[in-house]
Swiss-Prot record:
Keywords (A to Z) from UniProt: ATP-binding, Glycerol metabolism, Kinase, Nucleotide-binding, Transferase
Activity regulation comment: Inhibited by fructose 1,6-bisphosphate (FBP).
Species assigned in the record: Pseudoalteromonas atlantica (strain T6c / ATCC BAA-1087)
Residues the entry annotates as binding ADP: 14, 18, 267, 310, 410, 414
Name of the encoding gene: glpK
Purpose of the protein: Key enzyme in the regulation of glycerol uptake and metabolism. Catalyzes the phosphorylation of glycerol to yield sn-glycerol 3-phosphate.
Protein residues bound to sn-glycerol 3-phosphate: 14, 84-85, 136, 245
Residues reported in the UniProt entry to bind glycerol: 84-85, 136, 245-246
Protein name (record): Glycerol kinase
Enzyme Commission number(s) of this protein: 2.7.1.30
Family: Belongs to the FGGY kinase family.
Coiled-coil portions: none
Pfam families per the UniProt record, alphabetical: FGGY_C, FGGY_N
One cellular component (GO) term of this entry: cytosol
An example Gene Ontology biological process: glycerol metabolic process
Amino acid sequence: MRIKDCILAIDQGTTSTRAIIFAPDSSIIAVAQQEFTQHYPNDGWVEHDPEDIWSSTVVVCRQAISEAIAKGARIAAIGVTNQRETTVVWDRNTGQAIYNAIVWQDRRTAKTCREMQDKGLFDVVNSRTGLLLDPYFSASKVAWILDNVEGAREKADAGDLAFGTIDSFLIWRLTDGQVHATDVTNASRTNLFNIHDMAWDPKLLEVFNVPKSVLPMVKECADDFGHTTEDLFGFSLPILGVAGDQQAASIGQCCFKEGAIKSTYGTGCFVMLNTGTKAFNSKNKLLTTVAYTIKGETHYALEGSIFIAGAAIQWLRDGLGVIKSASETEDLAKSLDDDHGVYMVPAFAGLGAPHWAPDARGAVFGLTRGTTNAHFVRAALESVCYQTSDLLHAMAEDGVSLDKIRVDGGMVGNNWLCQFLAGILDVTVERPKIMETTALGAAYLAGLKAGIYASCEQLASMNEVESSFDAKMPSSQRRKLIAGWENAVQSTLGYTK
């Protein structure tokens, strides 16, 4: 049976690269995944080898394409989604990175960002980008590479270096150096892009000391990003959609209307609220960012960023050996009648919104001789829900009210987590039928540009909810649990002072 107009979605994440091929009805034809090594050269530093990212991308794409073709699929286009903010600088002549990719979790430029803040530069950055002066974003990472790799500044000034987030690096490699481009969502996460003018900002380039010569061209999310070379997959494919992972997940969840909100639970957790065609400025340390630009119309989003979500479970598995697989966590959490006062604050890479404390470090409170592995697991899962509650509280302070939230990401296959989340948030939690919403969003963008889908309205009509979790927690219990969490967070912040 022939399946025409399939889309290959490349989902390049923090810990693995996935290739998923979707049929036009959004059903999955083929999936391939490969993890790659995380590098921690110093305290608070996180790096990836760009060659690991590239090789894993080629491997999973070839595997998925082979499987899909064997099933009679014809692939029409590629959509790309990626870990945002992670920064690569490479030589335009050789295509080789001059330093490892500095990952979004990396905190090495915290001092630089504090010094810039002390110089009164916060408003200069925030008013243009909607972001904060934080090492999370790309600008200070680019500057660090240019300042710390011998000869890099000279090469950049000569026009021999290119900077990009992971999407740009992959597009460069996929097109054999023919296209140096990014999309508006990834550009909006660099601290170099003016989200009101929708262009690279000369003042920000001056402030961060980043030369314009290294920057990629900025395109819409559903746009022409060039073609792959035939030698990669045996035939050339157009790259027609690009978005950062959280924006792609929002698109995959069909959050096209103002007020639609989703929360993605992967390595980190990211809550994104569509605020329509106007940028909404938070007074509670939430980020204003670009949700997407499609067919000339830009929508903005209010975003809360949590650095550690699924990464806490990964730490329990790989760092402490508490579990062998993430699949064990649901049964372990359910094995306890309550949390017994154990709280985990997973500030392994500082705390994100709404605290923005880059120097914070992780802690576990309430340990006794009776504490078991199950308590650690439950505390880790609960910490994700409490952090989400912090974000929604900040949104409420900004005047946003909601009665439901759409969730996605690898963690939400855990029913216990979804039910606890609904209780702590006091809202209905909706889980989609297709869990791969990040990759699906990239596929939707490519499909829109390819003409497979006519409009965002058509995509919204295809969206299906698999499960709903209603809030069942008594308000007194909710208040008690959140008070315990807030005490744990304040104790953690106090430790770092």
